[in-house]
């Protein structure tokens, strides 16, 4: 218990300070080289590696990443998920507009070019579609969690269909991804407060996760793309859960 307390005391303030440093680095790049995607992505990758080291995150990746930019769609368990999606190309996220004003994390996400979606705005789908086209044409991958919220699992919530139809209309490839933590309680769900939840889990020596990458999907039928991605991810998550429990 004492070691867990000490780790939490070091890790959480350390994470906030480190994140603030990287936000400043992103801001500097934006000011000096606004369109240098490689440098922005390099900062993100460097940040993720240091988050792993500081927070004791260990990731096992199964499967092969696509060679071309893709829309990566995964199940959603926790706030940790955002640093778990590997990519060969610079990536941006699709996220709820409510997260845009989060101190430090929201600011950094905006500097990386995150596509903010306002679900209450009727024009949101059109704006999102154009933003996705723009990012993919510029060689960026897109990361989205189509459940729309976190869920403890191991089952999946229904996927929100919007991005699948945008993908079908634009001919954008989709790569399904399955995430499963060794400890299911790391899922951030319900009315859990962030600080108590983070304090509990970042006090552990390690946080172990399996990430499985599926085959890239293309097609003109958004409903079929959704069905195929959801079915594969649901089966793969159950397989990963069995691996952890065996």
Task: Give residue spans per PLM region.
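A cross-family acyltransferase "interaction/gating" segment
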Residues: 104-106, 154-224
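Residue-level preference for the first positions of well-ordered beta-strands
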Residues: 69-71, 139-145
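A membrane-cytosol interface segment of integral membrane proteins
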Residues: 115-136, 141
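Soluble, non-transmembrane catalytic domains of enzymes that act on hydrophobic metabolites at membranes
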Residues: 1, 60-62, 154, 162, ...
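Catalytic core of membrane glycerolipid acyltransferases/transacylases, capturing the structured
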Residues: 22-38, 54, 67-122, 188
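A transmembrane-helix-recognition feature enriched in membrane-embedded lipid enzymes
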Residues: 1-60, 107-111
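Short active-site segment of divalent metal-dependent hydrolases/proteases
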Residues: 150
């Amino acid at each position: 218990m004492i070691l867990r307390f000490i780790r939490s005391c070091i890790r959480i303030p350390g994470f906030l300070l480190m994140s603030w440093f990287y936000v400043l680095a992103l801001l500097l790049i934006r000011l000096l080289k606004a369109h240098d995607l490689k440098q922005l992505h390099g900062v993100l990758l460097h940040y993720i590696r240091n988050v792993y080291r500081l927070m004791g995150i260990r990731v096992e990746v199964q499967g092969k990443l696509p060679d071309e930019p893709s829309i990566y769609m995964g199940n959603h368990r926790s706030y940790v998920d955002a640093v778990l999606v590997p990519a060969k190309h610079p990536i941006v996220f699709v996220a709820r507009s409510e997260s845009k004003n989060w101190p430090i994390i929201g600011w950094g996400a905006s500097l990386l070019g995150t596509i903010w979606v306002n679900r209450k705005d009727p024009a949101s789908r059109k704006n999102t579609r154009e933003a996705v086209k723009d990012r993919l044409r510029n060689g960026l991958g897109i990361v989205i969690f189509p459940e729309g919220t976190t869920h403890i699992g191991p089952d999946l919530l229904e996927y929100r269909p919007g991005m699948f139809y945008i993908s079908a209309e634009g001919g954008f490839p989709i790569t399904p991804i399955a995430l499963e933590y060794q400890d299911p309680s790391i899922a951030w769900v319900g009315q859990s407060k962030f600080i108590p939840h983070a304090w509990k889990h970042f006090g552990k020596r390690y946080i172990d996760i399996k990430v499985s990458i599926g085959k890239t999907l293309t097609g003109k039928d958004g409903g079929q793309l959704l069905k195929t991605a959801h079915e594969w991810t649901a089966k793969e998550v159950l397989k990963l859960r069995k691996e952890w429990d065996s």
